[in-house]
């Protein structure tokens, strides 16, 4: 099975690539720079460009790409990347997700050959605060109008309803923030 992954160099992506390769999957990394080997696929979400020929060879896509949510450590001893969530940071968080989702919808709709599985990252914040209640896919989404909920709903998930091909299985992997204590990891969040 050929799987394309956006965000392959990120916190989740690099671990997922390693595991998928160990399990025998053929992994292709979407990159925004010049392609350096046969297992890379060029894409530019901000310019709405993608190598459609390589896209059409994939069986599945896992879409993880987006601006890091992690704050910078203002004290200088936590190796986190990112920055405070000021207006500019929020814009990068939102648009880095929205452009990618929009590009995939456009590419699917312009293609007669396409991956039949599309897995997108999203956030558990889409549900709002339910206290101690166990959250499932059927849990009511609270519309709090907060930025984190806006990103999950409008940037990650809603655009995907525009994919016209009804035989594409769309999976929404709603994650919370993840951390590691691995000191060798340069991206702790």
Go through the PLM ranges and name each one:
Residues 3-21:
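N-terminal Rossmann NAD(P)H-binding glycine-rich loop of SDR-like oxidoreductase domains
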Residues 30-34:
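N-terminal Rossmann-fold cofactor-binding loop
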Residues 37-47:
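Rossmann-fold cofactor-recognition segment
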Residues 88-91, 95, 101-145:
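Conserved Rossmann-fold NAD(P)-dependent oxidoreductase catalytic core, especially the SDR/UDP-sugar
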Residues 179-189:
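Single conserved hydrophobic/aromatic residue that forms the stacking wall/gate
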